[in-house]
C-alpha cells in the first residue's frame, strides 16, 4: 500500500489518496475509486481490499472538509449549511482528480459507503459514460435540486450497472431518503439491490462477497476467480 498526495490540479488541490499498488504496477489495470463516509478518512475502506478482485488498482480518496476526527464531503442534508451546490463542488473536485489520473487504466469504477455513495452516484450523474460500474454501500442518492452538473436523462439511456447493499434496519439513513434512492436507481441504472439483516449501518463479509461477484460480472478484464481466505 502506498500513500500519495497529488500536486495541485485546476482550481482545487488534489485530494489525499491511498493507493493499493505502486505507480509502476497500475498501467492497464481497472481503477476502483473508493469514497468513504461522513467523519471517516481515506484509510477507512482499505480494510475491504482482500475481498476485491486482484486486477483492480484501488484508490481510496479523503474527503476535503475536516470534521470531528475525520473528514466529510459536504454538510449533512438535515443541516442548514447543506445545499446541492456543496455536493457538486465536492463532486467536481473528485471528477477533476480522476480526469488527471485515469489515462493508464482500462476502466474506472466507483465504490462509496454512506455519504460516499452520494458522491459516487453524483459522479455517475455528472459523467454517465465514464464509469464501468458503481457500488453503493449503506448510502443514498441526493435530489437534483436543479443542478446543471447532473445529466440524469442521459444516464437513463446508459443503464450503468449499480450495486446497492443495505440493511432495512439501518438507523442512519432516513426512510424518505431511501425511498428516493430506490426509485432513482431503478429508473436510471441497471440496479442490483441486496438487503442484509443485522448489518445496520456498516459492511459485512457476505455483502463484500456479493460486491466481488458483481465486479467480476460487470467490469471488463476482471476474472471470476473465487475468494481465497
Predicted regions and their residues:
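Serine-hydrolase catalytic machinery in alpha/beta-hydrolase-like enzymes
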Residues: 7-105
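Active-site signature of alpha/beta-hydrolase-fold catalytic machinery across serine-
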Residues: 47, 122-126
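Gly/Ala-rich beta-loop-alpha elbow adjacent to hydrolase catalytic centers
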Residues: 111-116, 120
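A conserved short beta-strand
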Residues: 129-142
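Conserved serine/cysteine hydrolase catalytic core
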Residues: 142-161
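Acidic catalytic loop of the alpha/beta-hydrolase fold
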Residues: 143, 168-173, 201-202
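Short beta-strand/loop motif that positions the catalytic acidic residue
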Residues: 158, 163-166, 170
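C-terminal catalytic histidine-bearing segment of alpha/beta-hydrolase fold enzymes
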Residues: 176-229
